[in-house]
Structures are given as C-alpha cells and as structure tokens.
Design a protein with these regions (language model features):
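Walker A (P-loop) phosphate-binding loop of ABC-type ATPase nucleotide-binding domains
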Residues: 4-8
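Helix-to-loop junction immediately C-terminal to a conserved catalytic motif
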Residues: 17
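ABC ATPase NBD Q-loop/coupling interface
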Residues: 28-44, 110
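ABC-family P-loop ATPase nucleotide-binding domains
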Residues: 57-132
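Walker B catalytic motif
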Residues: 138-139, 146
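Helical segment within the ABC ATPase nucleotide-binding domain
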Residues: 148-161
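Conserved H-loop
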Residues: 162-170
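Conserved beta-strand-loop-alpha-helix hinge in the C-terminal portion
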Residues: 177, 182, 186, 190-213
C-alpha cells in the first residue's frame, strides 16, 4: 500500500491489528473469512497477525529475550513449556542473520535503541513469532540504506505462498529491495488505484498528483 500523508494507511493497519485508539463502528475486518473486529489485540496476535509500527514502543525493564519468550509461550497450549535451549539457539541464529549483536537479548525492549536497531528488533520479533499476516507500517521511515537492506532481507526470507504481507510506505525506495505482488494506492481513506509493481515506479516518477487525472 502506497499513500500520501493523511490518507488513512496507518489507521487501516491499526484497525486490522486491534489498536485501542480505534473502534470499528461500521463494516467488518475479515481474516480468512472470519470477522475479527471484536477480538482483542492478543487474540488477533494468536490468530496470526503481526504489526510493525513506524515508531516501535520502548518497554523498560523487560529484556528482549524475555519479551520474545513470553510472546511465544502465550501461543502454546496451556501446560506446554518452551524449550529454553531450542529457543535461544533459534533466536541467536535469527539475530546473526539480521546482523544483531547478541548483547541485545539482555537489553530492555527498544530502550535506548537507535532507529535502525529498533527496526532490526521488530524484524527479529516478526521472524521469531512466525505470523501468517505481517503488517509493516512505514517500517522504512528514517532508515539508512544498511538498515533498510536488513529489514528487506528479513521480509524476503519469510515470503511464502502461505504468508501475507501488507507493506505500507510513502516511498519507492523500500520496493527496490522488496518486490510487491500488488500495489494499492490510498487517498482519503479509500483505495483509489491498484496495479502491479510498475504502479510504484509510476508514483516515484510522477508523484501522487497523477492520481487527480488518473
């Protein structure tokens, strides 16, 4: 999804994820044919939805390792415990792929992290949680080229026919590294144009003004 500022793209992602700031008063949010509009955030997460924010929240006092372990534990049947050895082995392997220092595991979630570190951390969470639907809300905002490549690498490593991505961005730059199957342009809360990857290039060349005559 590509959109100018104020078009409703972040509202869309937060409504899908069940953010507390929004209440659905009309319409439905269908996930695999089931309306999830009344589900709580944690229920939507267990249903397979992951939302990466433009500005990831800090969680002082909770280490990255404990945060991830608790999130994975919450998805298991009652009475079943995570294998700690397997968990750390998997987490360290994923961190190595994302070029993350292993010291991050003991640091509080996003506290004192740079913008690029926060985005790497979110991609680590996404890979570890292995969701069926990933919502990336302007996750490329403010990233340098190295961090952008790491984010793209994480996304591309998860691409499959059984997983969906909704990538929300203003810019073509991210799509130089993540090739979309479909591009939808939003304006004033509605999808006003849809196409393939070539639509993103058209937007890059002409800007959003071309929509007024499209």
């Amino acid at each position: 999804s590509m959109c100018p500022s104020g078009s409703g793209k972040s509202t869309l992602s937060k409504i899908i994820a069940g953010h507390d700031d929004y209440e659905v008063t009309e319409g439905r949010v269908l996930l695999d044919g089931v309306d999830i509009a009344e589900l709580e955030v944690d229920e939507r997460s267990r249903a397979g939805i992951f939302l990466a924010f433009q500005y990831p929240a800090e969680v002082p006092g909770v280490s990255n390792a404990n945060f991830l372990r608790a999130a994975l534990q919450a998805r298991l049947p009652e009475g079943e415990e995570i294998d700690a050895v397997a968990f750390y082995k998997d987490m360290y392997a994923k961190m190595d792929e994302l070029e993350m220092n292993r010291k991050f595991t003991s640091r509080s979630v996003n506290e004192g992290f740079s913008g690029g570190e926060k985005k790497r951390n979110e991609i680590l969470q996404m890979i570890m949680l292995d969701p069926r639907y990933c919502l990336l809300d302007e996750t490329d905002s403010g990233l340098d080229i190295d961090a952008l490549k790491v984010v793209a690498k994480g996304v591309n490593s998860m691409r499959s026919d059984s997983r969906g991505f909704l990538v929300i961005t203003h810019y073509q730059r991210l799509l130089d590294y993540i090739k979309p199957d479909h591009v939808h342009v939003m304006a004033d809360g509605q999808i006003v144009k849809s196409g393939g990857a070539e639509l993103a290039l058209e937007l890059e060349e002409s800007g959003y003004d071309f929509l007024k005559t499209a």
